[in-house]
């Protein structure tokens, strides 16, 4: 998925869609993060709805924000 070595990848569920392609995601470990859609998902018009399972990349510097990189089928 990502070429970056210092990111943390976790799975979660979309709990709330927000404006400007932002989403509130409930991670599998119970934490909630604010995540936006990655650029490639925007370019390919991949739609994300409430309840979808997604893969989220988190930065080790700010664990409250993330980037959605994959939507599971």
Swiss-Prot record:
SMART domains this protein is in? Answer: S1
Q: What is its main location?
A: cytoplasm
Under PROSITE patterns, the record lists: S1_IF1_TYPE
Q: Which UniProt keywords apply?
A: Cytoplasm, Initiation factor, Protein biosynthesis, RNA-binding, rRNA-binding
Keyword Acyltransferase assigned: no
Give the highest taxon in the source lineage: Bacteria
The Gene Ontology CC terms held by the record are:
cytosol
Q: Which InterPro entries match?
A: NA-bd_OB-fold, RNA-binding_domain_S1_IF1, S1_domain, TIF_IF1
Cellular compartment(s): Cytoplasm
Domain S1-like: start-end pairs: 1-73
Report whether Repeat shows up as a keyword of the record.
no
Q: Which residues form the signal peptide?
A: none
Q: Which SUPFAM superfamilies match?
A: Nucleic acid-binding proteins (SSF50249)
Question: Which molecular function terms from Gene Ontology are attached?
Answer: ribosome binding; rRNA binding; translation initiation factor activity
- Tell me its family: Belongs to the IF-1 family.
Role, per record: One of the essential components for the initiation of protein synthesis. Stabilizes the binding of IF-2 and IF-3 on the 30S subunit to which N-formylmethionyl-tRNA(fMet) subsequently binds. Helps modulate mRNA selection, yielding the 30S pre-initiation complex (PIC). Upon addition of the 50S ribosomal subunit IF-1, IF-2 and IF-3 are released leaving the mature 70S translation initiation complex.
Q: How does it assemble?
A: Component of the 30S ribosomal translation pre-initiation complex which assembles on the 30S ribosome in the order IF-2 and IF-3, IF-1 and N-formylmethionyl-tRNA(fMet); mRNA recruitment can occur at any time during PIC assembly.
| Name of the protein | Translation initiation factor IF-1
Native source organism of the sequence = Chloroflexus aurantiacus (strain ATCC 29366 / DSM 635 / J-10-fl)
Biological classification of the source: Bacteria, Bacillati, Chloroflexota, Chloroflexia, Chloroflexales
